[in-house]
From Swiss-Prot:
This is Transmembrane 4 L6 family member 5. One of its GO terms (biological process) is regulation of G1/S transition of mitotic cell cycle. The chain crosses the membrane at residues 10-30, 46-66, 90-110, 157-177. Acts as a lysosomal membrane arginine sensor. Forms a complex with MTOR and SLC38A9 on lysosomal membranes in an arginine-regulated manner, leading to arginine efflux which enables the activation of mTORC1 which subsequently leads to RPS6KB1 and EIF4EBP1 phosphorylations. Facilitates cell cycle G1/S phase progression and the translocation of the CDK4-CCND1 complex into the nucleus. CDKN1B and RHOA/ROCK signaling activity are involved in TM4SF5-mediated acceleration of G1/S phase progression. Pfam families: L6_membrane. It is found in: Lysosome membrane; Cell membrane. It comes from the Eukaryota. The keyword rRNA-binding does not apply. The lineage of its organism: Eukaryota, Metazoa, Chordata, Craniata, Vertebrata. One of its GO terms (cellular component) is membrane.
Length: 196
């Protein structure tokens, strides 16, 4: 596969993943679809905006850059086999890789610690000391009185962020290697076009 075609495929995969992360993080801000608890009772991992910033915006840029690097075109005055766009894609992919790692680490921590909720009359991270074992014991989830169903909400959305960021790490890594090859060797489409 040409570096250009690979870049386009990776970019078209990264863009929807970044949008999924942005939407998931936005939903984490409104537990159970209500804004009643948004001001004072959201967990730190929600406020760190890992899905919006890390898995979202920091991955959206390399996605767009990879799509552009996969397109035909010249940069500057003469054609350079798309090497300039590939070079930009190398840097963007490195930034996207860091963003996806940030999203993975914050979301994984959010899953391990659990949500901040009202239990036994106090707002706290009641599952923090369980080291994530609450994830397997669904009977504990109902112990949180407010926000209603917050554990299910957080587990679902943080799991989605973890899965999306793992895919983003993989795709950004592939694009980092692919774009580096594209910078060094150029795009093979020019060679294919001349042989036909």
């Amino acid at each position: 596969m040409c570096t250009g075609k690979c870049a386009r495929f990776v970019g078209l995969s990264l863009i929807p993943l970044s949008l999924v992360c942005i939407v998931a993080n936005a939903l984490l801000l409104v537990p159970n679809g209500q804004t009643t608890w948004t001001k004072d009772h959201l967990s730190l991992q929600v406020w760190l905006m890992a899905g919006f910033v890390g898995g979202g915006l920091m991955v959206l840029c390399p996605g767009i850059s990879a799509v552009r690097a996969g397109g035909k075109g010249c940069c500057g005055a003469g054609c350079c086999g798309n090497r300039c766009r590939m070079l930009r894609s190398v840097f963007c992919s490195a930034i996207g890789l860091l963003g996806a790692i940030y999203c993975l680490s914050v979301s994984g921590t959010g899953l391990r610690i659990g949500p901040q909720c009202l239990m036994n009359g106090s707002w706290d991270y009641h599952f923090q000391d369980t080291a994530g074992s609450y994830l397997l014991n669904r009977t504990q989830w109902n112990l949180c009185v407010e926000p209603p169903d917050v554990v299910l909400w957080n587990v679902t959305l943080f799991s989605l962020l973890v899965a999306a960021s793992c895919l983003e790490i993989l795709l950004c890594g592939v694009q980092l290697v692919n774009a580096s090859i594209g910078v060094l060797c150029g795009d093979c489409r020019k060679k294919q076009g001349s042989s036909q």
